[in-house]
Amino acid sequence: MVRSPTAEDIRSAYRLLLGREAENETVVENWQRLGSFDQLREAFLASSEFKGMRPGAPSATLVPLEAPPIDVEWQTDAANGAALLAHVRAVWTRLGTERPHWSVLSAERFQPENISESTREFYASGAQDAAMLVACLKRHGLAPAQFPRMFEFGCGVGRVTPYMAQAFRQVTACDVSASHMDMALGIVKGAGLDNVTLNLVQGAEFGMTGAFDLWFSRLVLQHNPPPVMAMILRRCFSLLAPGGVAAFQMPTYASGYRFEIAPYLQEISNAGGIEMHVLPQPVVLKIAAEYGCFPLEIWQDGAAGNTAGWVSNAFLFRKQAAHTAMNFSLGTNFRTGG
């Protein structure tokens, strides 16, 4: 009979593998839901924190504070917005069909020819995302029970969704790839979860059709052009309930990065791989302020990889109980486009 890890087993794993104590008891409880020692071990060994501790592991280099501004065109009209979204859908429909797991976590062991040996590790890694979110809430005296309607933007093949469904009363998740969604549905049904709804992203609603109390996205927004990122955030903040929280990650700076809509649209017919994009931090703050959302914390994380010159931020916003738009002006580097 397989014995599930106890709370003390989890604490010991933290001490032995990460050299520290667990953040709090909520994190310990989330790890216990993995159900087996094999899953626990694989999730810890696959974590970015453990990998960063290994001798010779690449370390992120901080971008200096004197870094120059970047030129990003982030607003557009409806026609160009639809063209950009159609491109994103085409890319991810193909990736979701050809290399579904690798398109979510781009490691060689998750390529189609290797996934049979690493499926358990792949899905176990989703526990870390849920644990990070719960810990993030905990730092501000908040708990999942306060946010019954949770929305996961970019659920992929269902790597994280089951863990979110264990922590939140009702979970709605979406993705732009139909093949991803089919696989996510299989994971949800296989786990016997009856509190999950899956929406396919088909237009400017981005799969968000009703209000929610908490919005979460990680390793997703960065693969969308800046105008699409901005459109997604506007939709998110507009539907976030008063007092609700938005927790998400995206790159906000990259040395030498530049984005112009017209040249990009002219070249997308030749593109087809995974793209990495940036939405500058002042733009994120401006959009949030327009919908009465204020930052609780902004952390620099390593979610964009250890590529030199890149900055990725983990944001936590909360919407005011009474929506009051806040004024926020931008400098000339952030253009509205047409």
Stretches found by the model and what they are:
Residues 1-60:
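Composition-driven recognition of low-complexity segments enriched
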Residues 3, 16-22, 174, 210, ...:
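Helix-turn-helix-type domain boundary/helix-start signal
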Residues 6, 10, 217, 280:
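Hydrophobic (often cysteine-bearing) scaffold residues that line and stabilize catalytic clefts
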Residues 62-167, 172-207, 224-231, 235, ...:
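Class I (Rossmann-like) S-adenosyl-L-methionine-dependent methyltransferase catalytic domain
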Residues 214-227:
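A short SAM/SAH-binding and catalytic strip from SAM-dependent methyltransferases
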Residues 206-215:
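A short acidic, Gly/Pro-enriched loop at the edge of an enzyme's catalytic core
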